[in-house]
Amino acid sequence: MAQLPPKIPTMTTPNWPDFSSQKLPSIAATAAAAATAGPQQQNPSWMDEFLDFSATRRGTHRRSISDSIAFLEPPSSGVGNHHFDRFDDEQFMSMFNDDVHNNNHNHHHHHSINGNVGPTRSSSNTSTPSDHNSLSDDDNNKEAPPSDHDHHMDNNVANQNNAAGNNYNESDEVQSQCKTEPQDGPSANQNSGGSSGNRIHDPKRVKRILANRQSAQRSRVRKLQYISELERSVTSLQTEVSVLSPRVAFLDHQRLLLNVDNSAIKQRIAALAQDKIFKDAHQEALKREIERLRQVYHQQSLKKMENNVSDQSPADIKPSVEKEQLLNV
């Protein structure tokens, strides 16, 4: 009977887990509560082995389907930046001031809680709180058992760290958008919180950022319009080229035919010019021949008249002279 495991210790009030803070109590915490209920009863060896086995097994994986609660990460800070260009100067300044105020407040509150409670979980860690509790079961067995108040404090600190991490991410994005210039001298040794606050509170820099963004947007719009106009002109010219190219080819063919006809006409004109020259020369020769024949005829007529005068009387000479005059005319 001495080697059998003892009965379950009777507890006056059950130590139920607090689901409102989204954290399940570990097995080590339950065992410690049982130990406080029965201080005279020592933990047997089989319970220690069970606790060690559960701690090593739960440390190897992150989360299983049997876990009833899932810890969701907060949405990223870049979701609400789609309508960032629509803010005016006053809304832009008020948004930056609220972010800096919340960031500084959460930062100081986080340091004060870390000084009193101890190191807490980071918001970037994707493991669940139950995994952290399972990994730290061996240490909790050697230390004092935690109370419900400590669990509540851990949950509050984790939520505040998540909010502080989100604010830090937003402030980092704002600093990257502001395009800040490096600081010289002793001002460069200041902390990032004070420098980011000074940069954000500068209205001239904010206005310059907004003006640069608007000018860049206008230039992009102008470039897109110019590109669209060029594309339209190119398409119209291409359609005109496609329409006029067959007409140009037809006109080129006609031009070649006309050039051939023109060359033939030129050759004919040259031949006609040579024929005209020959005909002119022949006409001149004919004119000279006519003059020569006329002179010969006149001489023969004179000889006949002389012969007839010698043979005929003077009465017959007068009509012959009249005939000769008529022939000369």
From Swiss-Prot:
SS bonds (residue pairs): none
Keyword terms: Activator, Nucleus, Transcription, Transcription regulation
GO molecular function, one term: DNA-binding transcription factor activity
Compositionally biased tracts (Basic and acidic residues): 139-154, 319-329
Chain residue ranges for the region called Disordered: 1-22, 98-204, 304-329
Keyword Cell membrane: no
Subcellular location: Nucleus
Bias (Polar residues): 10-22, 304-313
Compositional bias of kind Low complexity: 119-133, 155-169
Pfam assignment, any one: bZIP_1
Record domain bZIP: where: 202-254
Oligomeric and partner information: Forms heterodimers with BZIP18, BZIP43 and VIP1/BZIP51.
Stated role: Transcriptional activator.
Name this protein carries in UniProt: Basic leucine zipper 61
Species assigned in the record: Arabidopsis thaliana
